[in-house]
Amino acid sequence: AGTDRPLEAAGVAGAGGFEGTIGAGGAGGVGGAGGVGGAGGAGGWLYGDAGAGGDGGVGGAGGTGGLGNRGGAGGAGGAGGVGGAGGAAGLWGGGGAGGVGGTGGGAGLGAQSVTFSSSLSGLSGGDGGAGGAGGAGGAGGTGGWLYGGGGAAGSGGDGGTGGQGGAGGAGVFSLFGSGGGPGGNGGVGGVGGVGGAGGRAGLFGVGGLGGAGGDAGDSGEGGFGGPGLAGGLFGNPGNGGVGGIGGDAAAGGAGGAGGNGGAGGNGGWLFGNGGAGGSGGDGGAAGRGGAGNLGSAGGINAPAGNPGSGSVGIGGAGGAGGTAGLFGDGGAGGAGGAGAAGGFGGISAATPSAGSEGAMGGAGGVGGNARLLGTGGAGGVGGGGGAGGDGGRGGVATPGGQGGDAGDGGAGGAGGNGGGASGAGGWLLGTGGAGGAGGNGGNGGKAGFSPGPTNFGLNGAGGGGGVGGNGATGPWLFGDGGPTPGSTGAGAAGGHGGDAQLIGNGGHGGAGGTGVPNGSGGAGGLSGLLFGEPGANG
């Protein structure tokens, strides 16, 4: 085993010894808090496990395995440190797992505020320092050349308070493809970590799944999902990772946006289907507005309540579907995330305090294309718009005074658009994919209550529905254009039906959304140049 140096803050620990022909490599030594863990020793050339990397400020790398053995695991990172990479296997063994990233440090405290005498105002306290970033996860080790799978990537460490979560480690090439590690979660005010990419497959293997994006802390943005990676000659790819959820706001603050979904991987070159795009994360909710102060006796109530937050988290966009192999189907686009609801208005005094508008839903992802004989992937559904926040309640009058007006309700958020033109059908035979439906518009917020004899507020307007995605064009020789769902929200126009090309019928136009006014129907797709019927209008 390598020499430990845990008490030397920046020391580098000794590496583990290695074996010649048959036998296990030694473990790497443990490094100090700011040092590097020792690398694991290599396993024997013919037979023998590799030694594990030592823990440290930066984890040591795992050693390489023998011909028939597994690579050593990477050491864990210290506080904020990077996890060590997993060791590679020889001929048959699996790669070692990557080390976990260290947790970021907490935020520093702000300076305490100073209070003066009653005739002067006190000074504000200082802001707290930013939290440390979480360490990145180590990469997974490479699988054995013939049979071994790649090691899993280490997950990113959590960010400290105010810190950003670490990115997930990427998967590595192997016969069967290892998955990416998930992104670390952000601390309060922190951004979620990005999910790691899935591992690439070998000749027959399946691509690794993209890592999920980390969830955000309060007011932070959700991390993006990692992309799925392509399959081998015959294998299917990994799907895109799901976007992280946006953080909720503190009182009166803004909610964070949801992370975007990762793109689906492409199918194997010959037979594989395209992977589905990951769904977008939901937006974070906004905070409630603060209450107004009461006026003095005998007068009108003076200061108004703070309005609800005008900035709420929008839903993340769905990831695009992957392209198919020569004979496979395109992957479906991911659904858009939901928009967050608007914040409630505070209790008003003389001036009304309105609720804030709901956020827009995320757009659906585009469907993946087929190549020769397959069906195009469907476009993703748009996310629903968030509901508008309710208006604030009118303030109660003090003796001899006048009550405050009630606040108006916030407008509902617009629904997300459906996936745009969805995937095209195969060049020779196959059907174009359906367009994604638009998301529902959010409901308007309710008016606040007034105790009188003052004004009641108005109800907020509902949000418009998202526009449905267009259907895909049909294949060059035979086949129909894709159908197009209409918008599911209020008043939006339906999408255009897909056009046929040489022989085939046009797709049906999407229905218009209901509302005031109602949305117009989408136009039907064109017929094929030689034979076919045009699509009906929505």
Model regions and ranges:
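Glycine-centric low-complexity repeats
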Residues: 1-538
